[in-house]
Amino acid sequence: MQACMVPGLALCLLLGPLAGAKPVQEEGDPYAELPAMPYWPFSTSDFWNYVQHFQALGAYPQIEDMARTFFAHFPLGSTLGFHVPYQED
């Protein structure tokens, strides 16, 4: 059994570079730059009304996305992966 696997592995290693295989993604890393801060144009009470509505529907992934957008506007936004500009108090 091993006698068949060794030549097969050697053949794959030798023919691999000749196949010209390239990685699918040639550009830079899309996650290298932090995403822009999302915009939440509504009030806080609107946010909680949406949370209650999505809870009634059982749409928990949508609640997570909406919460990330809402809380990105507070100082803890940098912990969510967004670049928050420096704000003086």
Curated annotation (Swiss-Prot):
Keywords, A to Z, come to: Secreted, Signal
Which residues are the signal sequence here?
Answer: 1-21
Is the keyword Iron in the record?
Answer: no
Q: Which InterPro entries match?
A: Otospiralin
Bridged cysteine pairs (disulfide): none
The tissues in which it is expressed are: Ear specific.
> What GO terms in the biological process aspect are recorded for it?
sensory perception of sound
Secreted listed as a keyword: yes
Q: What is its main location?
A: secreted
GO CC annotation: extracellular region
Q: Where does it localize?
A: Secreted
Q: What does this protein do?
A: May be essential for the survival of the neurosensory epithelium of the inner ear.
Q: Which family does it belong to?
A: Belongs to the otospiralin family.
The record ties this protein, via PANTHER family, to: OTOSPIRALIN (PTHR35073:SF1)
Protein name as annotated: Otospiralin
User: What organism does the UniProt record list as the source?
Assistant: Homo sapiens
The gene coding this protein: OTOS
